[in-house]
Amino acid sequence: MTVLAVIAATLGAQPARAEGTLTVCLNEDIPLYSLHHGKETSGFDLKVAEAVAQRLDRKLVVQWFETKLEMDSSLTIDANALLSDKRCDLLGGYPLIKGTLGKPRVEIARLPGFDGGTADDRRRRVRLGELMPTRPYHRSVLAAVVNGTAVTKPITTLADFDGLRIAIEGGTLADAILMTWRDGRLVKQITHLIPERDDLLGRLESGAFDVTLVNLRRFDAYVAKNPGTKLKAAGFQHRIGFNMGLVGLATSADLIAAVDKAIADLDQKGELARMAAAVGLTYVPPRAPQIADNIAMSDLAEK
């Protein structure tokens, strides 16, 4: 293949961008954040994207993609690849952590699966750019969830987990927090379940365990599917959490500045909380600093 042919193939792989549109990449399977099944779409991130596009006087186009909800390099690389391939202007539902922003650790990566993608797209490699965030529009937190039949005492600190049967998904941030709390004081009460295989909240519902520490969005999604549930959010939220926003390439700084103004307007008018309530999501406002430091083991120590 000639050099010109290679260039033509690369340009041909990039989608055409219509004037007056705002294209946002959203994960297709994170209930209450963003969901796409057939013609059905829903979620808080989708509503925020719609509201931002309206304030920018643009038509929203959503590029749905597939990736796991993990705050690690997988999401970071997937997001960067989609943006660098011009699949979207921005990507929503992104954790604002220093290690997930800026220049990537690798220069080239494959694209994640995305709606409309072909076999050639799955094989292609994309040169990555520098990620730049918008201001956050909500916060992702870990919350104590209890079986309301078995646990009646208030849970206001991790000390209140003492004496309860604790279930936790192994290898997660919640696992690290509970296993290291007060030099392992809760270790003998903890049962580890396997993420994506064991039904953590279902096991809690059955009475096999008393309490867990889980992302509040997951609990909200469980309640939406099981309105008669015995499970309750006990009120305790761990201090370690992550602000969530949109992310784009640093070359889109002007667009990101405009989006910042739109998000600020939505926040000032109380629209963000109303949009979250409309999809059944407990709204937690962002906290300073807007961008969190990378988590170290020393951060897990009780403060």
Indicate where each model-derived feature is located:
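Extracytoplasmic small-molecule ligand-binding "clamshell" domains
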Residues: A18-G102, L193
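Periplasmic-binding protein-like
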Residues: N27-D29, G116-E130, R135-A143, L216, I263-V279, ...
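Ligand-binding cleft/hinge of the Venus flytrap
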Residues: H36, A49-F65, L158, G171-I194, ...
